């Protein structure tokens, strides 16, 4: 069953990609969807068998690397962390496959699209099941390549080309440091197998663990779009909307957080890495929330919302609450996929326009889409008893419950981020569905809900967004849960804060995020409805214009990168190519070898004079040289060099 679970998406991808012309569009739909849905049911069985029974399964497939002391097996491990990620990845992936049947129905390259989707799913499965860092890295690079292929699916669009390259190159920065971290693990521990590394981690110097942890954190920063290496995420919205739902909800962006959770037995022994995670997540949460508030593209707003929630997960990792980070990751996948697919339904209905300032009044035309996006938004802002409430608010409470200065500051910073998350969620809903119509009349004439293939995934995800958090909270974060007793997640006893979070945090600080978010949402709606002139006048004032430009242009970070980093790197590359590659390297390399070979062949050709006595002299010199070589190899080497030099001088004089 477990090998079938891994192989099925790959088989679907191969059939759809290589035999698409034979099976046709409907055949590609059927094969890829059946393979992924079957894999999903197998994953649910694995969740109950492995997770609830605490019976990790390891499958050894083949020997991969066997060089001196390095021995790497191609093997897969199924534990509670793996099967929890399966639930997220495969349920969302199967629903995205079904949704794409209708959404991509008019595209001429359906087989290629579904092949990429299934390949993406397969690579994510490899990433979460790998039993060592090397196999994990295969899946890590695989999802990066598939992301490039999917974002650049409409390859005739310049914006898609640029966005896919941005995603690929930005992730290479993190991948480079992750590779350095893997080499550091290999150098320190002598192996890259999870069980070996994690068993030895307590006995190693904290400085070594810190260096390795920072390398892993930078790798996760790129993949999970944290501040500094985040610029690829909003640009990746150029791909089809189902791709956005798959990449930014359940697969690629969660890979970085998964890496940190999987490495919990390692980074738990470095307080520096945990503090870095804490602050990185807090800064990312506020940073992305502020930018998202000033965007006008509906998909980019949701993308920055994803970035904000990933920051929350990294905060949970910094608090050593890995089970809480996993719980939020799983919850977030469902309501974020619902937001993206709901946005896709809106875009599909209004002739592919993504600027929500040109929507308005769509509640009457898209009642189902409005309902599911309302549910997803309520879950995103952690309204009580929705799925997001059980994990997001618990992360904020845990930050306060650690009772350190840094975690208390992070609590207030993350609360501010949650407030702005509520604001832009209300903004999207209000301007898309509730305000007066602002778009062209022709869009409203043709606006309609999608067919069954588009509506069924929305309804299923809406159910998950309401009930999943309540039904599974005791499994993931309950005080008596035994779900993680297989040691897939490790929390050092001195870092355990779950009891303090549950019972010691004052009620005021538990309610503060909810009160702030509701108050700010009501204030924003009141200002928009009853005092719109005040907002408009402020926006067109000099101060308002500067504030809007600063946040709308994403803190000018991309401008800074392009002007000072990219330009400098390109100049350095140009000078290196001009002065080094085309200079000494070329002289010593191809050009020098060519000229040297020609000169040598000409010199040897000049020795052929056609005179018998000259050839007799060559034979005599060769004989003397051989005898001298044997004799002087046991005596003075300097004399041997002198004789060789004399022979060459005689040859040259004879040639002249």
Curated annotation (Swiss-Prot):
GO terms for molecular function: NADH dehydrogenase (ubiquinone) activity. GO terms for biological process: ATP synthesis coupled electron transport; electron transport coupled proton transport. It catalyses: a ubiquinone + NADH + 5 H(+)(in) = a ubiquinol + NAD(+) + 4 H(+)(out). The chain crosses the membrane at residues 4-21, 28-50, 81-103, 112-129, 133-155, 176-198, 208-230, 243-262, 272-294, 301-319, 329-351, 364-386, 409-431, 452-471, 514-536, 603-625, 629-651. It is an enzyme of class 7 (translocase). It is found in: Mitochondrion inner membrane. It comes from the Eukaryota. Its EC number is 7.1.1.2. Its main location: mitochondrion. NCBIfam families: NDH_I_L, PRK06590.1. This is NADH-ubiquinone oxidoreductase chain 5. It comes from Aspergillus niger.
